[in-house]
């Protein structure tokens, strides 16, 4: 470049001034020649930064070179210094300007990345909503077709999944729709009706009915001695073991809208009610005996206060007919796969035996839900063995004066939730018996001397 060459000439001129051709007198005020320093300074001041063709082209380099060469010859030190300072200031300003532009570009790139993430999350959310809407629309179409077939007294036929999906993918007018979602009759013209997938109670022949009744009788006889020999667990309500799913399915009937509304109202999670308390209440309220198909379950609406749980419950796979509790349990394990993921409330002490039994059954319930699929021999929360985590949690929520007794009770090897609940209930039974000390309130902190609560009678 010409600029380094000018600097090299300037250094050589400093050490060998005799090489200069011009003298300082040549640039005297009386001369009419134009001062190259002033001419170059004017060009620099009027040049636009950094888009000017003058500042970015060969014209600037040549002007700088000739100006430095002139000052080297006339030995004008001040002019050379001012020129260098002017160029240094110009380069510094350009550098600061470019640095600001780069910073703005980086901020813009970060904003675009953040917008991309937000847009991706929004798209996923809308995609999930669309899937839920398609699922609900499919269920409504099947149910409407079932109602129309009953009104028009048409024979029962199997629902065609392809026709239902085709209706969802295009505009659908329920007023003009002819209700054709059934599979086509085979070429032989067989009039034997097949069951639609949404019907709950199939019509059985006399032979199959006789076989089913015989199977029920054998099942009841086999279950009778087991129920009698099992330990009776005393809870707030009597515990009734559910029948087999096949028996409950055969007894399934179509619920009316009033029944579904009442069922949803009684099993909906209450305000400030923890999820573990709510799921145990559904179990105790007969949720394990209330048989529903998927359409009836979806008709109940959101039952939990957790929005993510409700979304999962609306998209559970259709596995036929099952109990209300099983529908909720299937969504539960997807929302909270382990007991650690279920956020527990602040530790609260329980002040009565009934509350302690209820609290222990809640711990057993959430433990059972997480291992329900791998432990089919456990038929309820009462069959769950006391684990170390359950023991620590339960003892931590116990009053300080009761901890030693409760801890020693829970340390028995292989003891279950039902066994502990039964032993705690024995304290209530003992407190009901009259003694010389008199009767005490059931489950209160003032019980007989046989229990570790005796010193709390005055509290």
UniProtKB/Swiss-Prot annotation:
Transmembrane helix listed as a keyword:
no
**Record keywords:** Antiviral defense, Host-virus interaction
Q: Is DNA-binding among the key words of this record?
A: no
Can you quote a single GO CC term? Golgi apparatus
Q: Where is the composition biased (Polar residues)?
A: 226-238
Q: Which stretches of sequence are listed as region Disordered?
A: 192-269
Give start-end positions of Basic and acidic residues composition bias.
Answer: 213-223
Q: Which GO terms describe its biological process?
A: defense response to virus; response to virus
Instruction: Please explain the role this protein plays, according to its UniProt record.
Output: Retroviral restriction factor that prevents infection by gammaretroviruses. Acts by interacting with the capsid protein ca after entry of the virus into the cell. This interaction presumably disrupt the capsid thereby inactivating the viral genome, making it unable to enter host nucleus and integrate into host genome.
The protein here is known as Friend virus susceptibility protein 1
Q: What is the lineage of its organism?
A: Eukaryota, Metazoa, Chordata, Craniata, Vertebrata
């Amino acid at each position: 470049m010409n600029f380094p060459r000018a600097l090299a000439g300037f250094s050589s001129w400093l050490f060998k001034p005799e090489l200069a051709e011009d003298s300082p007198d040549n640039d005297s005020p009386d001369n009419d020649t134009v001062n190259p320093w002033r001419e170059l300074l004017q060009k620099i001041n009027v040049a636009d930064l950094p888009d000017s063709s003058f500042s970015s082209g060969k014209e600037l380099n040549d002007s700088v070179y000739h100006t430095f060469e002139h000052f080297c010859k006339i030995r004008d030190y001040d002019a050379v210094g001012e020129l260098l300072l002017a160029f240094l200031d110009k380069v510094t300003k350009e550098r600061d300007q470019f640095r600001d532009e780069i910073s703005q570009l980086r901020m813009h790139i970060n904003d675009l990345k953040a917008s991309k993430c937000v847009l991706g999350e929004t798209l996923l959310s809308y995609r999930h909503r669309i899937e839920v809407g398609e699922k609900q629309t499919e269920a409504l179409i099947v149910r409407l077709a079932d109602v129309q077939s009953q009104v028009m007294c048409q024979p029962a036929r199997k629902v065609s999944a392809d026709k239902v999906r085709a209706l969802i993918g295009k505009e659908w007018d329920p007023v003009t729709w002819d209700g054709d979602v059934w599979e086509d009759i085979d070429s032989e013209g067989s009039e034997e009706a097949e069951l639609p997938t949404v019907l709950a109670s199939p019509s059985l022949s006399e032979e199959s009915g006789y076989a089913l009744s015989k199977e029920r009788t054998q099942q009841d006889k086999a279950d009778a001695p087991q129920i009698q020999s099992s330990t009776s667990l005393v809870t707030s309500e009597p515990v009734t073991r559910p029948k087999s799913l096949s028996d409950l399915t055969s007894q399934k009937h179509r619920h009316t809208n009033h029944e579904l509304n009442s069922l949803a109202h009684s099993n909906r999670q209450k305000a400030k009610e923890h999820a573990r308390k709510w799921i145990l209440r559904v179990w105790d309220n007969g949720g394990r005996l209330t048989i529903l198909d998927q359409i009836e379950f979806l008709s109940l609406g959101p039952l939990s206060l957790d929005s993510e749980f409700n979304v999962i419950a609306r998209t559970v796979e259709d596995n036929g007919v099952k109990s209300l509790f099983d529908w909720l349990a299937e969504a539960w394990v997807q929302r909270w796969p382990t007991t650690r993921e279920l956020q527990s409330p602040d530790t609260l002490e329980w002040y009565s035996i009934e509350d302690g039994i209820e609290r222990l059954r809640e711990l057993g319930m959430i433990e059972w839900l997480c291992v329900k699929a791998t432990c089919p021999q456990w038929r309820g929360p009462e069959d769950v063995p006391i684990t170390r985590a359950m023991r620590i949690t339960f003892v931590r929520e116990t009053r300080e004066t009761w901890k030693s007794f409760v801890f020693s009770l829970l340390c028995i090897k292989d003891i279950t939730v039902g066994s502990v609940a039964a032993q705690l209930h024995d304290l209530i039974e003992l407190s009901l018996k009259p003694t010389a000390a008199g009767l005490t309130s059931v489950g209160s902190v003032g019980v007989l001397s046989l229990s570790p609560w005796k010193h709390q009678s005055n509290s």
